[in-house]
Amino acid sequence: MLTDIFPQLRHVDYQVRYDLRDYTFEESLSVAEHAPEKLSQMELYRIAVSYASDSARYHGFFDRILELYPDDPAANINAAASLLQRGDAAAAERCLDHAAGAIAAPDAAMASAFANNRGAALLLENRLDEAEPLLRRAADAGRAEARRNLEELERKRGDNARLERYRNISQ
């Protein structure tokens, strides 16, 4: 009787409700210095993009976001973009490998960002034939930086052709 009836009598259900307010930008800056793990990925992103894109703070925040959210495709794509700006195509490729599912994401912005970043990494590695379809896909989705990367790809092809001609002349 104790195990069958009394546990039923002592059953209590709790329901707790609370509102979690967002930090203001100024509060986020302060919290980011001391306890960035208390901030959401979006709050950290807003802080990162408030710095110049060539600054150490900008890149540092994207590195930190990746440390805190290592399995998030957006964190990996953004970290890859930061690494590409610093010329580290190999590290960017590793981030993009973690976000590989994003290329088929229903979110067109995420898929085009992935395609552009992967194409840019391949471009930096002089793998032009592999880079082109990815950059075209991103450009067709409306990504302006992909169009600029395609222009760079064509310049690089021209440079490679000139270099090959010079090599043939000197032989």
Task: Enumerate the predicted regions with their spans.
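N-terminal targeting segments with Sec-dependent signals, encompassing both cleavable signal peptides
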Residues: 1-171
